[in-house]
């Protein structure tokens, strides 16, 4: 995965409130997405911006801000966003979605974590295992 740093930024009339100053010595995050039209969106740092028609690139100071913006982009039916970490040395690391599929979607190679092989209606009655020494989540 490569990050095109020449991608235009959304039109934003404000500032990030100093969020990106620390990124010069630590790391910053970039989110890219493609929009079918120009539309206004809310910045995670406050204020509003206008996303460009086509590809967009936005630098933010925290990964959580990128994830919040990604959640908002999904309300605009934009599902192709990608999040990168950029180190001060210029090294770029691809972060999200890690294997190309969003975490809540099913992926054939993905193993399920903390899942039960039956529906919630088949759970045992907690009263029947109360003093048996077995916890409810293990039964």
Curated annotation (Swiss-Prot):
Keyword Flavoprotein: no
Principal place of residence: plastid
GO terms under biological process: photosynthesis
Disulfide bond entries: none
Membrane protein topology class: Peripheral membrane protein
UniProt key word Membrane: yes
Source superkingdom: Eukaryota
Transmembrane parts of this sequence: none
Alphabetic keyword roster: Chloroplast, Membrane, Photosynthesis, Photosystem I, Plastid, Thylakoid
Compartment list: Plastid, Chloroplast thylakoid membrane
Gene Ontology CC: chloroplast thylakoid membrane; photosystem I reaction center
Pfam families per record: PsaD
Membership in a protein family: Belongs to the PsaD family.
Function according to Swiss-Prot or TrEMBL: PsaD can form complexes with ferredoxin and ferredoxin-oxidoreductase in photosystem I (PS I) reaction center.
Protein name, entry field: Photosystem I reaction center subunit II
């Amino acid at each position: 995965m490569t990050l095109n740093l020449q991608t235009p930024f959304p039109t934003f009339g404000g500032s990030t409130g100093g969020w990106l100053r620390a990124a010069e010595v630590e790391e910053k995050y970039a989110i890219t997405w493609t929009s079918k039209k120009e539309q206004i969106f809310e910045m995670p740092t406050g204020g509003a911006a206008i996303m460009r028609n086509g590809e967009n690139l936005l630098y933010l100071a925290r990964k959580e801000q990128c994830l919040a913006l990604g959640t908002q982009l999904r309300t605009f039916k934009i599902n192709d966003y990608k999040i990168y970490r950029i180190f001060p040395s210029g090294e770029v690391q691809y972060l999200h979605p890690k294997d190309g599929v969003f975490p809540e979607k099913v992926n054939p190679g993905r193993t399920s974590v903390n899942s039960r092989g039956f529906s919630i209606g088949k759970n045992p009655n907690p009263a029947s295992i109360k003093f048996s020494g077995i916890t409810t989540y293990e039964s």
